[in-house]
Amino acid sequence: MVTSRAGEIAQSEIRRNNLSRMLSELHLRGPLTRSELAAILRLNRSTVASLIAELAARGLVWERSRDKPAPQPTPGRPSPVVEICREGPAALALELSTDWIRAAVIGLGAFVAVSVSKDLSLASSTPEQAVDEAHDLVGPILARLDHGPRVAAIGVSAPGAIRAEDGYIYHAPNLGWRDVPLGSMIGSRFADLGVPVFVGNDAHLAASAEHMRGSGRGTADFICLWGEGGIGAGIVVGGKSLSGAAGYAGEVGHMAVDPEGAECRCGSHGCWETEVGEEALLRRSGRDPKGGSAAVADLLEAAGKGEGGALAAMAESGRWLGIGIAGLVNVFNPSRVALGGLYARIDPYAHDALVNELDCRAMPAPRAMVELTTASLGADALLLGAAELALAPILRDPATVPLPGDAAAISSRRRARPPSYGWTLTPAEARR
């Protein structure tokens, strides 16, 4: 009896694992035929059919006919494809940045149902005001989803040292926030949704999205440097995100590069951020260091016109970027480093100075292996990363999504065509 019970548990765990594998493949690869799923997962066709049926019953996938013929047509009827159900569970993704708030409802497969943004200086706002602004921003977009995806979780991207287990912000220097229980605040303000809340560091989430869908795809060792006001890093080692003991890893902006340097917002002196952050860039160009995104846009326009002061400021920031990146290359030996946010935008003007410094300071062996690129998902990397964080529990265990009781509704959903609203984000669209 004990052996039989143990066997049942083992079979149940195997099935849950296979459901997770199948849903994850569809989430990342897009529509696949049953034959393709069988080959990828190395499962027999009857098992694949059974898994598809359960995922469909849970409202996670559906089957449809091919819109286009297969590259190599085969005799008989065209094979239907299995794809993510766009009316299934989705994440409410929130991005809290220094100069704006963005929100989107994003489903499995990176399907963006709706998004909205508002320019707002969070550095001049209290955490309570920021959460209220986010709630007010989100209300109208949720009202547009009467017949669309259902929000199953909230994912939040924010700068600073954030405790992974509960979304507690220990310190966000660029927002002026310290000891902020952001996760519980979001949960209370959005209590009407009745869903779990997940909060992550912006650079970590950007790296996650880029590693899964963008510039880091196909690499096991990857670093994404991200920042607007400051700079942070998301680090992937051996295919896994490096978060540290409590989730605080990656605060590379506060590495000391000049002990006698300028005072940093964190309270130390000579942090890397004081040389490569937004304020340093604007100050070098003769602009108001507190000018924010509008001043950066003006600087980029001036650089595009060949203005000497703007180009010199970019080059000096590039030099300091190279100094810091060389240290990261020496320590982590990544195969690829991607620049995102502000650093992707200034790269055309800072690139040569950055590479020159990197070549001089990185050890020859790890330098020879690393590719320097820009983040391909653009500004949407943070929202996509927040959505991935929120949807991860469903991907790990699709069986947690309840089975609806209406068999007719399940059958209808299997046959239905995808709705016409929304879009699936691709790297090409992210560069628009």
Regions found by a protein language model. Name each.
Residues 81, 91-95, 151-155, 222-226, ...:
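Short glycine-aspartate micro-motif
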Residues 28-29, 213, 228:
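Short helix-capping/turn signature of helix-turn-helix
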Residues 107, 164, 236:
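Short, acidic, Ser/Thr-enriched surface-loop or helix-capping motifs
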Residues 112-221, 348-360:
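Glycine-rich phosphate-binding loop and adjoining helix at the ATP-binding site
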Residues 158, 227-229, 278, 341-342:
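Short secondary-structure boundary segments
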Residues 1-78, 83-117, 123-150, 260, ...:
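ATP-binding/phosphotransfer module of carbohydrate and carboxylate kinases, centering on a glycine-rich
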Residues 217-275, 423-427:
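Glycine-rich phosphate-binding loop of actin/hexokinase-like ATP-binding domains
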Residues 203-204, 231, 339:
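AAA+ ATPase active-site-proximal loops
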